[in-house]
Amino acid sequence: MGSGCSSLSYSSSSTCNATVFSISSSPSSSSSLKLNPSSFLFQNPKTLRNQSPLRCGRSFKMESQKPIFDLEKLDDEFVQKLVYDALVWSSLHGLVVGDKSYQKSGNVPGVGLMHAPIALLPTAFPEAYWKQACNVTPLFNELIDRVSLDGKFLQDSLSRTKKVDVFTSRLLDIHSKMLERNKKEDIRLGLHRFDYMLDEETNSLLQIEMNTISCSFPGLSRLVSQLHQSLLRSYGDQIGIDSERVPINTSTIQFADALAKAWLEYSNPRAVVMVIVQPEERNMYDQHLLSSILREKHNIVVIRKTLAEVEKEGSVQEDETLIVGGQAVAVVYFRSGYTPNDHPSESEWNARLLIEESSAVKCPSIAYHLTGSKKIQQELAKPGVLERFLDNKEDIAKLRKCFAGLWSLDDSEIVKQAIEKPGLFVMKPQREGGGNNIYGDDVRENLLRLQKEGEEGNAAYILMQRIFPKVSNMFLVREGVYHKHQAISELGVYGAYLRSKDEVIVNEQSGYLMRTKIASSDEGGVAAGFGVLDSIYLI
């Protein structure tokens, strides 16, 4: 079992990081950041509006983080050379996405390629917080597994949400059928990502959410780290920073290793790994980077199918073997299926049920998927709930230290505070994929609307403490052009977990993803198209 940062390779001291990019340069209030890979990377930027001052009864001034180098000392000619070399490296090494202006770029490989939006140089991140995030990852992995086994907890916690959220209701129906059949998942695989921000007000590393399905960018995030290491080896002396402070990021390798071990546990050498994908996916190269490791390192056949194709081509045999297109499936790896848009018809829901009824290893199972929901995360933050699943008091304290404030809308006092000071809260629906959160005065308006409509609608949302990170000046590169912005970053730490009955085979921190957006944007309406990938520079 891996713990701490041991699963990443270091040279002396190292670092890992990632960033997000926008086209506006006006600094303003920041927000916690949940970015959909398919939206924030591939849509055209729009001009951002300055945000209104927070109506919090106090003046909040965002603090700028001390840069690891002085951008003003880098002349334009030097920066242009860095950008040129970065774009060449990206093109040669596959740090690319599909260009939305090309019609076939989402389903025909090699058509309409462009470099992924990137931070030109890595972002400073305190080493102590980096180690904290690494150290708790195996604990969160174990927590997810234990929660997933408590079917009553999942059903009870989400029972009210089921009444107001059709998507969650359909997932719960599948879960309920598995409980009725007493269906056991002897082999359980989770490829997770835990997202954090550094809160300037409390000087704490606070978790934004746990992601248990379709955790994107293990491939591209690894490449961004390698890109930054390459640039710093060439230009670090001139800039005044050391490439050895950027940690080696092995996210794709470790995810592929976990998938391969799950495939081995299934014990059918002729079976394949099936990746569930969207019909159009301009982030396909991130997915193919992982698939290529499975083929080349582990000699495993990988197939890609949409849920509609699984329903059309799939069946479950008497021994519960999943057959798709005439091939037995050992592992089902979801890179789709996390939003209602991924289930436009009954065909997709039939496929989800078919997969769940089979003996294939699911990544994630329906129980793991539900465990990652916003409501379950809010329930876990309640006093005494972690103790239901974990015994070690020190481990529980480590996890609780990462929790931001999370509340049900049944808490009338918190709702009152959020109406009075909406800038201190984020309102989150039961949705994955980004672009759904509610900020600022919209929090007040939605809470007042729900009060008029009655309490039933409350179950569709939770309230979270709004996190205010420090701001960094950064060069952000999109479509071959760099811009300087004040930006904020979000650290995602990957975790891999594999269990076969009573044996834990894998439980480790598995690399990282850094994303950044400009400080003036909220998520909703402006986050799409304003993100870049980045890496960490440990300080």
From Swiss-Prot:
Cofactor: Mg(2+)
Residues reported to bind ATP: 209, 374, 428-437, 439, 464-467, 490, 517, 523
GO MF term set: ATP binding; glutathione binding; glutathione synthase activity; magnesium ion binding; protein homodimerization activity
Protein keywords: ATP-binding, Chloroplast, Glutathione biosynthesis, Ligase, Magnesium, Metal-binding, Nucleotide-binding, Plastid, Transit peptide
EC number: 6.3.2.3
CDD domains to which the protein is assigned, alphabetical: eu-GS
SUPFAM superfamilies: Glutathione synthetase ATP-binding domain-like (SSF56059), PreATP-grasp domain (SSF52440)
GO cellular component, one term: plastid
BP GO terms, sorted: glutathione biosynthetic process; response to jasmonic acid
Binding site for Mg(2+): E209, N211, E432
Cofactor annotation remark: Binds 1 Mg(2+) ion per subunit.
Subunit structure: Homodimer.
Protein family membership: Belongs to the eukaryotic GSH synthase family.
Protein name stated in the entry: Glutathione synthetase, chloroplastic
Originating species: Arabidopsis thaliana
Organism phylogeny: Eukaryota, Viridiplantae, Streptophyta, Embryophyta, Tracheophyta
